[in-house]
Structure formats: C-alpha cells, structure tokens
C-alpha cells in the first residue's frame, strides 16, 4: 500500500500487487463501499511489452523504501528447463529527477526522531518507531498529538492514532473521542 513518498500524490492510496501470471505489477485504488472496501479496476503499473511476454521476468514482491521509491523484486526460476538456474533483479522505481538513494539518518533514540520515523514511507522503519514509541508511554503523547493535528497527508495523520491507542488510558481516551 503506497501512502506517501517520492512518487507523488498520484499514487497515494494505491494498493500494489505483483501478478506473476501476467508478469506485471498491478495497481488498485481501494474505495470504501458500505461496510467493505472495493479494490477497483486494476491497471498495470509495471509490465512487459506485449512483444516481450516470453522474457524472463517474474515480479514477486514490492516494498516502499525510505526515500519513497518502490523496490520491485524479480525472481526467475528456470526449473522448467531442468538446468535449475536462478536469477533475479531488484528494480528501483522512482521519478526521473531522483538521484541515487542516500542512507537515511533514522534517530530511534530521541522522541522527535521516533516521531519523524513514524512518518517514513518505509513500513519497517515505521514499525520499529511504533514499538519504541509505545515503550516510552505517555511521555510521547504531546508529540503524537501534534503530528495528528498537523499532518496534511491523511495516511500519515492516522499513524499516531495507532500509537496513542496503545499508551494507556490517556491515549485511549483521546482516540475514543475521535470515534
């Protein structure tokens, strides 16, 4: 699920799925409908040209990096020819104006660093931040409340709610009032 990052608002809220049969990275626009979510009509975000469908390309996984770029894993297992050759590639998908990714400076020690990590497009960075924020308890409540009230991206805005609900009675009361 692409929430925020370098690819811009056009992909915000897009669910991404690797389709190994079609050899494409599929994109969906989930929309709420009654008590469920409809995935919408899928479209190929990345795929082979029709004339290249027999090429060795098999998208298996997609993740969002710390810079908001997509990292697409292509794994090709040539067991059908009985030579058991394995090959694969990791593709970085980003805008043309982006250079090579820089190693992120993630501060898991300070409250401000953890709140910044909570805003990362990378799920693994956010998960580590959530665990550390919950462990700090009510001491981080003001920073989380400030992020909730100031975030412009709705996906970033809901992240502190998840943490606040785990902080005990104060956080749970705040979240309950939002319902």
List each model region and its residues.
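Structural detector for internal amphipathic alpha-helices that build alpha-solenoid repeat scaffolds
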Residues: 100-105, 123-136, 155-169, 173-178
């Amino acid at each position: 699920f692409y929430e925020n990052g370098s690819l811009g608002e056009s992909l915000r809220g897009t669910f991404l799925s690797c389709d190994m049969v079609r050899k494409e990275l599929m994109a969906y626009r989930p929309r709420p409908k009654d008590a469920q979510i409809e995935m919408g009509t899928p479209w190929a975000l990345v795929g082979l040209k029709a004339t290249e469908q027999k090429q060795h390309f098999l998208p298996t996984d997609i993740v969002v990096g710390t810079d908001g770029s997509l990292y697409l894993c292509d794994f090709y297992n040539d067991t059908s020819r009985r030579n058991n050759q394995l090959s694969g590639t990791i593709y970085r998908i980003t805008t043309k104006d982006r250079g090579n990714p820089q190693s992120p400076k993630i501060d898991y020690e300070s409250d401000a660093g953890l709140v910044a990590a909570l805003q990362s497009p990378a799920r693994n960075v956010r998960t580590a931040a959530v665990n550390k924020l919950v462990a700090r308890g009510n001491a981080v409540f003001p920073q989380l409340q400030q992020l909730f009230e100031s975030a412009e991206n709705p996906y970033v805005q809901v992240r502190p709610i998840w943490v606040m609900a785990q902080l005990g009675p104060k956080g749970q009361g705040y979240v309950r009032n939002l319902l």
